[in-house]
Amino acid sequence: MVKRRSWLGLALALPLVPGIARAQGTVVVFAAASLKNALDEIAAAWSKDTGKPTPKISYAASSALAKQIEQGAPADLFLSADLDWMDYVTGKNLIKPPSRFNLLGNKIVLIAPADSRTATLAINGGELAKALAGGRLSMANVDSVPVGKYGKAALQKLGAWNDVKDHLAQAENVRAALLLVARGEAPLGIVYSTDAAAEPKVRIVAAFPEDSHPPIIYPAALTKDSSSSDAKTFLDFLRSAKARGSFEKQGFTVLVRSASAT
């Protein structure tokens, strides 16, 4: 009971996570912030097809969501932006292992404001630091948020980390990091390619080699405490041809074969 009562305090400490009280009969999904555009569209399509209430989706950093699940937050599904945080909740016995699968792939890119004079960059310490011109590199938290961890790993592999590590503007999730660049508050940032494509106020100035960081994989699973049959149906729908179309439209790589939608 203590954990069940304590999750609310954690939720209040994470202002980017919306209210997550489970409405009667409504599927509750915790999903990485980078999934918002695609998943909102998919949830609406599932609701239209089934006649069920549109799932209530809370978007935030995978790290924040995993911690909320650990504290007993009422979620039916968890969609993480990396394997580490799904492994974390798996290790805590908080998901149903048979339901888990790898759903999507993504890429990370370096972005600048759309009106920036920054040209296409080679990602190395000297050029990246020079392009910052005294400003800061916008990244999601490099120690806990998946896109921040991927970005740090890539910068280390490419020999640029030591030149920029003291010039970071760290945000709570990828959308917050994206916003800093879109507003011109940071001259450069590292985000997923899907987020860059969705924001007209930024442009891509470099793409990170896929071998410069761990594979970007989005796993999905039912939580251990979910008793909703609709949650299983929605999870299955994520593998449907209709969902594939939404994911691919946003630039994700779909890692599962399409299944017939229920």
Report the location of each language-model feature.
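Exported/periplasmic ABC-transporter solute-binding proteins
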Residues: 22-73, 80-83, 87-262
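N-terminal secretory signal peptides and thylakoid transit peptides that target proteins
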Residues: 1-14
